[in-house]
């Protein structure tokens, strides 16, 4: 696996090196689909798209064993091809999903409220963040999660475990 892919997998909270060579492409299904939905929502300026996405992403963050995108990957790709399925998301990935839910909710509510300038700004920020994942393999919310954990650990003098110590 390329180093940038290992970095992405590691920052999502999975151990590296990982025995599953399909993990990177499995993890990328969600940002690709979310990116497509954000492009559609932005293009048509439909709050329903963002509000539905907010609900789906919030569900993924709050009930990680029932993540719709992971289930879609498992039932359409992993099981038919006999490759390892995605398991429950580690904390950095759930934090990223929660962040996506909050952004989607903000975009949807901005459109509902008629605050189109705010909606465009939020949509632009979301598209840049998604492009960062898809092009650079760098997830801003997962990095923020890691930075917040390090900061809280040093502030309170308590060691904080890391899901993946090899990053």
Model-flagged regions — what are they?
Residues 1-167:
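Membrane-interfacial helix-loop segments of redox and metal-homeostasis proteins
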